[in-house]
């Protein structure tokens, strides 16, 4: 979710709306409220940009603020739609790690939708994979397999497992070609 750069709210204001934004009218700013907002910003790694206009933050920074906004109400379930959309690889990894910590340390169930699942695979407990109007559910090991995903899509899908990581790619498995050494310039001995 990209936030309008003209939105005149700071990151801390957005988090505060998660605390009391469902109530009508302004709420007094108390030391306890400020402390709670600061603690939540710290918990998601957003303290450094707490006073920046939220619309000027990067996609990963905005995502942290929005997660803090959702968490400050102490939910049992965190429901996210495409939390990695528009994020670079590093920011996506940081958000995945943040979600893992939220689930394990704060005991909040995390349910999300995502088109790109590769970064999420190492931390998912269960998966419901929906494709072409059908679904498969179970553990990552049960669902994220070439045969299961190929059947769902009606198209070859390859699931690669390398060094404990899983990568899903479209198309049948192809053995990597062994590249011939590139031609080099003649050696000094050949030139003389």
Describe these PLM feature segments:
Residues 74:
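Conserved catalytic motifs of ABC-family nucleotide-binding domains
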Residues 53-57, 61:
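Conserved ABC ATPase signature
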Residues 114-115:
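H-loop/switch region of ABC-family ATPase nucleotide-binding domains
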Residues 146, 152-192:
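ABC ATPase nucleotide-binding domains
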Residues 78-82:
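Catalytic Walker B motif of ABC-type/P-loop ATPase nucleotide-binding domains
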């Amino acid at each position: 979710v990209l936030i309008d750069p003209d939105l005149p709210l700071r990151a801390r204001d957005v988090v505060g709306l998660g605390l009391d934004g469902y109530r009508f009218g302004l709420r007094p700013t108390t030391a306890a409220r400020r402390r709670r907002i600061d603690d939540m910003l710290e918990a998601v790694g957003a303290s450094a940009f707490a006073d920046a206009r939220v619309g000027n933050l990067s996609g990963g920074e905005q995502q942290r603020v929005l997660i803090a906004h959702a968490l400050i109400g102490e939910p049992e379930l965190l429901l996210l739609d495409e939390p990695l959309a528009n994020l670079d690889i590093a920011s996506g990894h940081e958000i995945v790690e943040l979600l893992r910590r939220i689930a394990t340390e704060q005991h909040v169930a995390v349910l999300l939708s995502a088109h790109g699942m590769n970064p999420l695979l190492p931390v998912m407990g269960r998966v419901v994979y929906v494709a072409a109007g059908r679904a498969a559910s179970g553990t990552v090991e049960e669902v994220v397999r070439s045969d299961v995903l190929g059947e769902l899509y009606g198209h070859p899908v390859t699931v690669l497992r390398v060094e404990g990581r899983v990568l899903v790619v479209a198309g049948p498995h192809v053995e990597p070609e062994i590249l011939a050494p590139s031609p080099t310039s003649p050696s000094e001995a050949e030139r003389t």
